Every structure is written in C-alpha cells, then in structure tokens.
Amino acid sequence: MASPDLSLFTYPNETPFVELDCLAAFNALTDKEKLYAHYLSQASWYGGLIVYVQTSPEAPLIFSLIHKLVTAESVEDLKKTAIESGKATEDDVKALLVYISGILANSGNYKGFGDSKIVPNLPKERLENIILTSAAHKADPKAIETLWNACADKIYSLEHSHQHLGFGDKGTTTYFTPNCTLKDSELVGNFMKKYNLEGYNNRLFKYEDDGKTTYEVRMASVLNQQDDEPFLMKDTIYEGCTFRVTRGDYSGLLELVCQNLEKAKEYASNDLESNMLEQYIKSFRTGSLDAHKSGSTYWIKNKGPVVETYIGFIETYRDPAGMRGEFEGFVAMVNKEMSAKFGTLVAHAESLLKELPWPSTFEKDQFLKPDYTSLDVLTFSGSGIPAGINIPNYDEIRQSEGFKNVSLGNVIPTSFKGFRHQFLSEADVAMMDKFAVTAFEVNVGLHELLGHGSGKLFRKEGDQYNFDVETVINPLTNSKVTSWYEAGDTYDSKFTSLGSAYEECRAECVGLYLSLNQDVLKIFGTEGVEAENVMYTTWLNMLWAGSAKALEMYSPASKKWLQSHSQARYVILQVCLEAGEDFVKVTETEPGKNLLLSVDRSKIKTVGKKAIGDFLVKLQVYKSTGDVKSAQEMFNKYSEVSDDGAYPWARWRSIILAHKQPRQIMVQHNTKVNGNTVEISKYPATAEGFVQSWSERFSSSKVESLLESLWQKDAKYFYAEPPAKLSAAC
C-alpha cells in the first residue's frame, strides 16, 4: 500500500495566522460587563479542554506535553535553546510551533474542519531533540519523558484507521470505544430512544462484565457514581445486553467550568442570565440534559444582551453516529450596526418564508421571531470557529420556543484575509475580491435564520399528530403523508451520520434561493448593479467552494466525506451541473494542472433558481416526513465522486490538492482580572503569538494533571496493552 500523502496531514510552515480583533467592542463594555465576559470566557476555555478527550485517545497527553513546554519558558527561549544545541534548525522549531498551533486551534490532533489527523511537519527525532533541550525537560525530565513516550508513536502514526475520525474499525473516535461498530451505535440508539435518552452529553463504552456484553452510557458531569444525589436509572437488560447509565465524565474539567459560571453569575445583567447560568451549572454538575435545555430556554428569552454567550455539548458533526455533541463555548459583544441589518431581516422573515418552494403545510405553524445579532467574538473554544450559528439544536425547543441566530461579525472578514481564489477567470477573481465579504454576510444571514430556522417536522405523539394527516399532501407523490417522527425520535436520531451534511445542504440552498430577492440585498445595503454583483458572487462563491475546495475534504480510499459543509457544497454543485443549459461549467484548461469554473449569471434567476428550488422541495419533504431512505438515496447520488464522464472529479481531485492553500489559524485575545477591572491582551498574528496566547490562557495550574488523569481513566478501553501509569507526570 502506498504511503499516505503527508501534505494532507501537516500544517505547512507558511500557515497564515490572523488576529480575531475585538478590542473596540470589548473596551466599550462597562466594568461589570467585562467581568461577566471574563468569567464566561474562562468557563469556555476550561470546557474546551473536554474536546481533547472527545477527539482521540492520545490528544489529552499531547495537550499536557505541549502546554508544559510553552509555559516553562518563552517561545523565544525555547527556540533559542533548541537551535543553539545544534540538534534542531530554525525550520524545525517553526514546524513545531505551527504543529502546536494546529493542535491548540483544533482542540486535538484531528482537524475540526475535515476530521483528518494532524501530524508534525518535522521528523520524530528532531521533535524529540527540541523537547529534550527544553526548560520543561530540565525542570522535570521524568515527567516530560513519560508523556513523550506515552504518545510519541501515536502522534506520528498514519495507519489507515488513524488517518481520520470514524468508528474504531475504520477510524479514530473516543465517543465510542474501538470495539464499537455502526451496529453497536444503532442498538444503543434504539435503547436510548426507548428510554427517552439523548446523546448530546454522553459517550459509549462497550465491555464484557460477568460474561455479558455491557454498554456503559457515560454522562458528562461533575458528580460521580459514588455521589449521593439521585441519578438516572438502574442497570437495564435490553436485547440481551446490559445497559449501564453512569456519570462523571470530564468531572474535573466541568468543576472548573462551573466555578467560573458561578463567578459570572455574580455579574449577570438580569434574572434571565442568572437563571440561564444556574441551569447550565446544574446540567454540568449532575449530567441532566433537561437542565441544559431549561438554560437554553432562558437564553432564547434573553433578547439582545450586550454580552452574548452559549456553552455546552452542542454540535454533533464529529460523532461518527451524528448524535453526541462536542463541547464548545463562545463569548462575544454585539455589533450594533450589523445587528440592525439582521433585525430588519428578522422583521421580513415571515414574508420571505412564503417564498420558499415547499408547500406552506411543510412550514412551522408559527414562526417564532428569533434574536439575530452580529457579534464580535472575544472567545470561541472548541475545534473551530464558525461564521454563524443557529442554536439551540434541541428539536422540541426549536419548534416550541424558537432559537437564536448569531453571525460572528469579526470572523467573516478575517477569514478572507490573504485568500486567493483559483480556477476562476480574472473577471470572477476581481468580483470575488470586491464582493465576497458582503456576499458571505448575506449567505450566512439567510443560511442561519431561514435555512436552519425553517421547516416543520411532522410528529406523532400517542394518537395525536402535529399536522392534519388527512389533508396534508406530499408534493413529491401527490398523495397523503405516510411517514413522520414517532415519540422519542429526533432529527439527529433518525438521520444519524447523514444528518449534518444534509441539514447544512438544506440551509445553504435556502441561502442561495433567497439571495435572489432584491429586498434581502437592500437590507444588506446593496442596490442596483452592486446588488446584482453581490447576488452573482453569492452563487459563484458557493459553486466555487463546491468545485475548488470541497474535494480537499474527501477520502478516495474510504470513499467518505470528511466534512459536512464541504459535502453539502459539492452536492449543490452537482445539482447545478445536472441542470444543464450551460448554466454551470467546469473544464480542464491545462491537462492535469488547472480547471476553470464558469457560471452564466444570466441564468441564475431561471435555470439556477429552478434547480435549487426543486432540490429544496425534496430536501424539506424528506426531512419533514423523516424519510431517511429516500434522503439517503438522493444525497448519496449527488455526493458520488466519479472518475469518468464529463466531470471526472476523482481524477480532478489531484489538481485541486495541488492548488490547496493552508487554512488560517485565528489568534484570540485573553482577559485577566486586575482588581475590579479586566485587562485584555493582544498577541501578534504569528505562530509565536498564537502559542504565547495559549501559554497565558489558564489561571488554574491543574489543567495538565486533569487531562492526564482523564487519559489514565479511559486508557484501558483504548489501548490493546495497558499503558504505563503517568504518576511521574501527574
């Protein structure tokens, strides 16, 4: 078997770093608001360390090792000592700093966008040399060597099952033990549905106990099994297996989260914020998902806060079963000027929903107008920073209470800095350079508010339906609806691993479809010729992402898509290519070297609108009715990467990879309490600045030992041979 292409798994030394600036917004806060933001940020950063435990068996140790390295001495001293030793070059040290940055930016050694492994861009022996000359090693050689020996091989391993996230037989995950397969996931999913459990805040451990297969559903909580407070349920026999619901996952880290949320509560601006934080604390303390839902309800009702935040086990993209949430937390300040535009969009939402191509019976009975704000991010912890969010993800709350939309205003322009658009004509490159930021703001606004915020799920609870089963007609069959969500079903539990890419595709299509509306473009400050250019750029950018970027996130070996948004955009491209009439074309202009994407802008409002509209009807009908089989068949067809025909994407992937640009890493601020005020720190947009920001991030010295103890607790489930104790390092 050929060796894997290392460029797919490394961050090159020229990886760009950009500053996520929010100084003006933060400095405009009152002292009380700054203290509120600070403690929420601390809670988010401590909680973000949970993602290392959720990513791979070795990730907690990698964090502990690199954190010891960068806190024992300055980056400059680390670099100077390594180079002067003669055992490492300046390029070696740069490669290490970029690797460390990649690990910290993704909260683990797998990319948050693409799920592929991150390995160092320098030989193992050179990395070891730098570690052995470090101040951390001089201070405690036994601890550093113990950590290095425990994770060195895993850091560099590119065995097939280590290259990407996935179930244990095909990939790496710690949401499940390695002996779990898709069949185990389905069995556990059925058990959880029967007993009204959801997967957001748990992991699954499979083992033998007294000769019987046992599935341990371990809930995230501060409290452990031995604590007296009543818990969920006793051991249960289901399908001949023992199911054991336990708690105490990530206990020490969640304790630090709760401590900081308690402090933040002292500076809350109203009862809604206090109640919200109280419920989050209860959820993280006990493992109660209902408490987090209650906190989310208070959060929705807290309209237009000056400091916005959300925290918990949220997005399910990286669980191979699509049910378990990765921890994330964000803290941000409202950008009033851009928020006013989103407020106007919300005011027009009900009329815009009527323009969507599915029948009104497939839309929610009542549109619950959400809070929609543009935010300047102070803190975003997790495996990546998105441009926009539509939360909470709990179906029942979204249908009954509503949701919030946030556009991360300082993320959008930052993400376009220094970017080159390949595979386009010079005229289209100029168009993208001029209008891409505005077009992306339009797309994000529509995607979050009316994409994720639209559509009804048909449900049956007991003998009651939430739709008229006698009169509602399926527009694809012209007959009555014959499928729906039963009691205990959620979108995630039914659509599982398909769910994320499918829903992102639906939201992206809504954004494209409604970007043709002149009133929408006017809301975002564009009219006339400029509005037409923004509309064209919105479509061009989506189709460019589907052709020029998406296949970076596809694995030919496993024929698996590695990232939901990339798969969604590729699918949209295929739908538009299928529409014909020379609306969209991709040609190989230089054999084996270059491609050209062209979009006939005169056909967007005709051919393009019809293609996306017809596709949207299918997407929504299958989602509303819970028709997973039809959804899967359709989505798989458009997701196929063929190596022949007019568009041999499998062959063209090598051309796309040859033009690949390294993904940016965003440098975030830190805050620190000084008396009754909060100081904010700014760092250079370099690998050195990024690493320094992390070396100064945590006020508690316990983070390394907590992650090491969590690794030790789980090690027997993830290693064939029991690993060495880390007592020397703890």
Show where each model-derived region lies:
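A generic secondary-structure signal for well-formed alpha-helical elements
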Residues: S44, L69-E73, K265-A268, L272, ...
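Active-site recognition of the HExxH zinc-binding catalytic motif
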Residues: T30, N270, A439-E461, A507-E508, ...
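Extended, compositionally biased alpha-helical segments that mediate assembly or anchoring
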Residues: L596-C730
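N-terminal-proximal low-complexity accessory segments that begin disordered
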Residues: A2-D77
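Contiguous, non-catalytic segments that form substrate-binding/exosite surfaces or channel walls
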Residues: L97-S101, N106-N224, D228, E239-F440
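Short, glycine/acidic-rich hinge or "gate" loops at secondary-structure transitions
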Residues: K79, I83, D271-E278, E461-F467, ...
